[in-house]
């Protein structure tokens, strides 16, 4: 018999030693060589099985460390079983709480193998690549006979209890209750599905609200419409951009366009008004005080003196006998006296009664009377030959 047979002897059963030796052991201990060989073979298989059971126990202890809620659920298994017995007495015909507790505290080799297969299947399903839209809250149902659907709460202690074929009917009923509670709320999954679709199709960056207004050319007709609207509102000082925009009623015109144009229009109007007021200040500055009228009097005096010189020059040319200095002095003296006699009463009357405009009109009338009467008097005197 070889040391490592190709096919192990499955007829061997490992069990604690019995007080009564069996007949099989007596037959195999017939010879000493056969006894030594059997002891060596049994020692090899015992070591192999011990290593396998130790690995399974280490896996189970690591799972209990990673999932601390399992101990709590196992310790409270009698409470769950009592509730199931109270509500569903037909589910537990032949089960006691002590049997369920011992079956979970000391799992058999078949349960451990099934648990390993379940964990491997769970890891393979979770490590699959996700294609399309990932719906984390609504995974597709896996029709596995021993795997319950994942509950809504990820840290539920009852979800950590493995449901095997040899588990108690109480736990299967508990898992079915969780399944119905998770399926009975379809609005929750629909809501998450809609939010994920909305987040997918929404743009990443929202559109800017404060976009700059496009440039616009102010034509003559548009400006005329603007000026008309400003005049209807009572001038550029009272008009507001919003009211002007409403009165103009132009399609592509914005409030920014009207605001900037109204500001420019106000600056132009104020500068024009300042220039006009500075140009007219020389004429209308002292109109009420009479200084402007005095300038007009000086201008009229110069004009009258020029007229008198024109009158005397043709007389001197026509009459050579009267070209002496005494005649010129008398002629100039008479003209000045006549002008003074006319001017003095007119000034007194105008200062007491008339305004500046009436003074100007009276001055024109007095100048016309002087120019009309003065040439006849010297002509009459010279024609008559009167000498003083």
Swiss-Prot record:
GO annotation terms (biological process): abaxial cell fate specification; carpel development; plant ovule development; polarity specification of adaxial/abaxial axis; regulation of DNA-templated transcription
Region (Disordered) location: 1-38, 271-326, 359-388
Pfam family of the protein (one): Myb_DNA-binding
Protein name per Swiss-Prot or TrEMBL: Probable transcription factor KAN2
Species in which this protein is naturally found: Arabidopsis thaliana
Compositional bias ranges of the Polar residues kind: 10-25, 277-292
GO molecular-function term, one example from the UniProt record: transcription cis-regulatory region binding
Domain of life: Eukaryota
GO CC term (a single one): nucleus
Main location: nucleus
Segments forming domain HTH myb-type: 210-270
Keyword set includes Protein transport: no
Keywords associated with the record: Developmental protein, Differentiation, Nucleus, Transcription, Transcription regulation
NCBIfam families: myb_SHAQKYF
Database matches in InterPro entries: Homeodomain-like_sf, KAN_fam, Myb_dom_plants, SANT/Myb
Residues in the DNA-binding region annotation: 241-266
Primary role: Probable transcription factor that regulates lateral organ polarity. Promotes abaxial cell fate during lateral organd formation. Functions with KAN1 in the specification of polarity of the ovule outer integument.
Note: Plants overexpressing KAN2 develop elongated and pointed cotyledons, and do not produced subsequent leaves, resulting in seedling lethality.
Compositional bias ranges of the Low complexity kind: 359-374
Localization per record: Nucleus
Tissue expression: Expressed in developing phloem.
């Amino acid at each position: 018999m070889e040391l490592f047979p190709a096919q192990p002897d499955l007829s061997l059963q490992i069990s604690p030693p019995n007080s009564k030796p069996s007949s099989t052991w007596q037959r195999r201990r017939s010879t000493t060589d056969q006894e030594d060989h059997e002891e060596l073979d049994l020692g090899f298989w015992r070591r192999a099985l011990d290593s396998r059971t130790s690995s399974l126990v280490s896996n189970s202890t690591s799972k209990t460390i990673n999932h601390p809620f399992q101990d709590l659920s196992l310790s409270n298994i009698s409470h769950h079983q009592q509730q199931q017995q109270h509500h569903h007495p037909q589910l537990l015909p032949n089960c006691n709480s002590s049997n369920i507790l011992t079956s979970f505290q000391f799992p058999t080799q078949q349960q451990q193998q099934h648990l390993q297969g379940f964990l491997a299947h769970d890891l393979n399903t979770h490590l699959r690549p996700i294609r399309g839209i990932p719906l984390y809250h609504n995974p597709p149902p896996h029709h596995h006979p021993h795997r319950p659907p994942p509950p809504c709460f990820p840290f539920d202690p009852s979800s950590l209890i493995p449901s095997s074929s040899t588990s108690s009917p109480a736990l299967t009923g508990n898992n079915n209750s969780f399944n119905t509670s998770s399926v009975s709320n379809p609005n929750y999954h629909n809501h998450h599905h809609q939010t994920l679709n909305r987040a997918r199709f929404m743009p990443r960056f929202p559109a800017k609200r404060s976009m700059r207004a496009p440039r616009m050319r102010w034509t003559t007709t548009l400006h005329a419409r603007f000026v008309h609207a400003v005049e209807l509102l009572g001038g550029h000082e009272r008009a507001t951009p919003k009211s002007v925009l409403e009165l103009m009623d132009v399609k592509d015109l914005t409030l920014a366009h009207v605001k900037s144009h109204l500001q420019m229009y106000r600056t132009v109007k104020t500068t024009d008004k300042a220039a006009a007021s500075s140009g007219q200040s020389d004429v209308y500055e002292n109109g009420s005080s009479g200084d402007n009228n005095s300038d007009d009097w000086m201008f009229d005096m110069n004009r009258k003196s020029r007229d008198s010189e024109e009158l005397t020059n043709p007389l001197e040319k026509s009459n050579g006998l009267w070209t002496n200095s005494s005649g010129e002095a008398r002629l100039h003296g008479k003209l000045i006296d006549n002008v003074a006699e006319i001017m003095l009463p007119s000034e007194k009357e105008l200062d007491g009664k008339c305004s500046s405009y009436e003074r100007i009109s009276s001055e024109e009338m007095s100048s016309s009377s002087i120019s009309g009467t003065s040439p006849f008097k010297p002509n009459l005197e010279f024609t008559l030959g009167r000498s003083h």
